[in-house]
Regions:
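Gly/Ser/Thr-rich phosphate-binding loop
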Residues: 263-266, 289-294, 303-364, 377
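Conserved AMP-binding A3 loop
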Residues: 63-68, 198-225
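Conserved AMP-binding/adenylation subdomain of ANL enzymes
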Residues: 221-244, 248-291, 305
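Structural core segment of the AMP-binding/adenylate-forming
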Residues: 79, 83, 107, 111-178, ...
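Conserved AMP-binding/adenylate-forming core of the ANL superfamily
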Residues: 49, 53-107, 124-129, 177
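Conserved structural elements of the adenylate-forming
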Residues: 71-76, 213-234, 299-303
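AMP-binding/adenylate-forming catalytic core of the ANL superfamily
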Residues: 123-130, 140-143, 292-295, 398, ...
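Conserved pre-ATP/AMP-binding loop-to-beta segment of ANL
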Residues: 49-51, 171, 181-202, 209, ...
C-alpha cells in the first residue's frame, strides 16, 4: 500500500496513511450491487427513515425521500422496467438531470442487473443517436423538457423501443409514474458479481466518436478508500449533508458525491437549478450543506463572491475537487474566506483517484495535485515507459496490477485497449512532474483531447459537426488556453468557396454545434483560414495550431 507514496517532509516512504491503514484498505466483495450496497443497505434498518434525498424545485418546493421510500420507489420502477423486458446486462439510458427520478432510475436498473447508461442533458441529437445506436439501447428514461429537441430526431434512434418521460409524455411515450408498478411482494434484487457491468458512460477521446466506457459494481467499493481521503476522513461525519452542482451523468456528480454519501447513510440535497455562485451560497446555507464536490470552474465562480461568511450562515466543512487543474489561489481563498478544507484529487474516468490531497493527514501544497493515494502506484514515465526522476516532465501513469478502480473496457470491446498501455503502465495522456517531496504538478495534455471546465471534448467530433454545416469545407479544432476554464474549444475553419466569413457565420457555427453535439462542446473561438499548416506527411499540423492558439491566449 505504501509503494511510491512519499513523506513530503522527509522524502521517504509516506507514513501519513499508516494510522488509517485498515480504513483505507480496498475491500472488494465477491458479490456486489450498487443499489443494494448504498440505499438498500439502510432501507430496512435504523436509518430507514433518515432522509436519503432532498430535492428542491425551482419554486422552492421540497421533496423529501427517506432511505426506505427511495428503495421502495426503485422497487416499483424495477417491476415496470422488467415488464418491458429489461433484464441483466442490458443498457438502459438515463437522460435526466439532478432529479429524484434519476436516483430512482439508477437504483431500479441496478436491481435488475441491467446497466445504467448515463446521458448528459447537454447532449444534442447527434451524440444521443450515436450513444443509443452504438450500445443498442432499447429503453430511455428522460425529461419532457430535455427530450423536446430529440422528438423530431426520434427516427434516427433506430434501436429505441421504449421512451419513459417525466413531466409530460406525448405520443407513444410512457409517463414515468405509469411505470411505477405496485406489488406487496418484496423485489428480489439480481445477484450481481463485483465485476458485472453496472455503469456505461460515453466519454470523448482525442479521435473519433465518444466511446462507451464500462464500470462494474465493484467501483463503489474501489473508490471508497480514496474518497475517504478526498472528503478529509469525514464521509461518516454525523448527519452530514452532501451536494454537488456537477451533472449526475458524470463521475464527479454521481460516483464522487451521491454514491459515497449513500454508502454511509448520509443525506444528499439536489436541485436542477443552473449553477450561479450567489444562488449556490444561498442553497448551501439553506440546506446546511457540509460536504461537496465541485469542479475547479465552479470554485472559481464562488471565489468571485465577496464576503461569503459574512453574508451567509454556512455549514460547509469540506469541498473536494477534480477534473481540471485548480489554481493555488482558489485553495487559499477557500481556507481564508470560507475557513474550510479544499482537497484536490487527480484521475480519469477510466481509472480514478491516482493522486490527491487530504489535509487531515498531510499538508496541502497549493498548485499541486497532491500525493499518490494508497492502493496506487503512480509514476512519471517517458514515451518508452521508463520511470522519470523527480522534476522531469513526462506522462503521468498508473501501474495496472489489477487495480479494482480500473474500468472493465469499452462497450463491445472488453479489457484495456493496447493504446492505453505502455508496458505495465496505464497511460493518462496528461503531462506532469513529481517533485522531490512526492507532490505532483500538472503540466498539460499529451494529445489532442481538450479538457474544458472539467469536460472532456474530442476534437474529431466537433470537427465532424462543423463540416456537416453547408458553409464549411474543412475544420481543425484545438484547445486554446483559458485562465477560467483551463482551456476552451477553438476552431480553425476553412469556408466553402463563395461563402462570406465573419462574426455572423462564426455565431451560426457555434449555435449549430451547440444544437447537434452539446452546449459545452461548441467552439468559443472561431477563426477563418484560407489554408492550414501541414506536416511533412501532408497532414494538418495540430501542434502548430495549438501553438498558435496558445500564443493568441497570451
Amino acid at each position: 500500500m505504501k509503494e511510491n507514496v512519499y513523506n513530503p517532509l522527509t522524502g521517504k516512504t509516506n507514513l501519513y496513511y499508516d494510522e488509517q491503514e485498515e480504513r483505507l484498505k480496498i475491500r472488494i466483495p465477491e458479490r456486489a450491487n450498487i443499489a443494494m450496497d448504498t440505499v438498500g443497505r439502510f432501507a430496512r434498518g435504523a436509518r430507514a427513515g433518515h432522509p436519503a434525498l432532498i430535492f428542491e424545485e425551482d419554486d422552492g418546493t421540497l421533496k423529501r425521500y427517506s432511505y426506505a421510500e427511495l428503495d421502495g420507489l426503485s422497487d416499483r420502477l424495477a417491476r415496470g422496467l422488467r415488464g418491458l423486458g429489461v433484464g441483466p446486462g442490458e443498457p438502459v439510458a438515463v437522460h435526466t438531470g439532478q432529479r429524484p427520478e434519476t436516483a430512482i432510475a439508477h437504483l431500479a436498473i441496478h436491481k435488475l442487473g441491467a446497466v445504467v447508461m448515463t446521458l448528459s442533458q447537454l447532449y444534442g441529437p447527434d451524440t444521443v443517436a450515436h450513444c443509443l445506436d452504438d450500445s443498442g439501447t432499447r429503453t430511455i428514461i428522460t425529461e419532457s423538457s430535455v427530450w423536446a429537441p430529440h422528438r423530431d430526431a426520434r427516427g434516427r434512434y433506430t434501436s429505441l423501443e421504449h421512451c419513459i418521460v417525466t413531466g409530460g409524455a406525448t405520443g407513444d411515450e410512457r409517463a414515468f409514474e405509469e411505470c411505477l408498478v405496485s406489488d406487496e411482494t418484496p423485489l428480489e434484487s439480481a445477484s450481481t458479481g463485483s465485476e458485472d457491468p453496472a455503469l456505461l458512460m460515453y466519454t470523448s477521446g482525442s479521435t473519433g466518436l465518444p466511446k462507451g466506457l464500462l464500470h462494474g459494481h465493484r467501483i463503489v467499493h474501489a473508490y471508497l478508500p480514496t474518497l475517504t481521503l478526498c472528503y478529509n476522513l469525514e464521509l461518516d461525519y454525523p448527519d452530514a449533508v452532501f451536494w454537488t452542482p456537477a451533472d449526475w451523468a458524470w463521475v464527479g456528480g454521481w460516483l464522487d458525491t451521491v454514491l459515497p454519501a449513500w454508502q454511509h447513510g448520509q443525506t444528499v440535497v439536489a436541485s436542477a437549478h443552473r449553477f450561479d455562485a450567489e444562488w449556490a451560497f444561498n442553497f448551501m446555507a439553506r440546506h446546511r450543506v457540509t460536504h461537496s464536490f465541485m469542479t475547479p470552474t465552479a470554485l472559481k465562480r464562488l471565489a468571485e463572491v465577496s464576503r461569503p461568511r459574512e453574508r451567509w450562515d454556512l455549514a460547509i466543512r469540506v469541498i473536494c475537487t477534480g477534473g481540471e487543474s485548480l489554481p493555488g489561489d482558489v485553495i487559499r481563498w477557500a481556507e481564508d474566506e470560507l475557513g474550510i478544507v479544499c482537497n484536490e484529487f487527480y484521475g480519469l474516468t477510466e481509472f480514478n483517484h491516482m493522486a490527491g490531497n487530504c489535509k487531515a493527514l498531510f499538508p496541502i501544497v497549493p498548485g499541486s495535485m497532491g500525493l499518490t493515494y494508497p492502493g496506487r502506484r503512480v509514476a512519471i514515465v517517458d514515451d518508452q515507459g521508463n520511470e522519470q526522476p523527480d522534476d522531469v516532465v513526462g506522462e503521468i501513469a498508473s501501474w495496472r496490477d489489477d487495480d479494482p478502480s480500473l474500468f472493465l473496457g469499452y462497450w463491445g470491446d472488453p479489457g484495456v485497449p493496447e493504446r492505453m498501455m505502455l508496458g505495465g503502465w496505464l497511460r493518462s495522456g496528461d503531462l506532469a512532474l513529481r517533485e522531490a517531496s512526492g507532490y505532483f504538478r500538472y503540466q498539460g495534455r499529451n494529445d489532442d483531447l481538450i479538457k474544458s471546465s472539467g469536460y472532456r471534448i474530442g476534437p474529431a467530433e466537433v470537427e465532424d459537426a462543423l463540416v456537416r454545416h453547408g458553409s464549411v469545407a474543412e475544420a481543425a479544432v484545438v484547445a486554446k488556453p483559458d485562465p477560467d476554464r483551463g482551456a476552451v474549444v477553438m476552431a480553425y475553419v476553412r469556408a466553402m468557396p463563395g461563402i462570406e466569413t465573419g462574426e455572423p457565420l462564426a455565431r451560426e457555427l457555434q449555435d449549430y454545434v451547440k444544437k447537434n453535439l452539446a452546449m459545452y462542446k461548441y467552439p468559443r473561438v472561431v477563426e477563418f483560414v484560407d489554408a492550414y499548416p501541414l506536416t511533412s506527411s501532408g497532414k494538418i499540423s495540430r501542434r502548430t495550431l495549438r501553438a498558435r492558439a496558445a500564443g493568441e491566449a497570451e
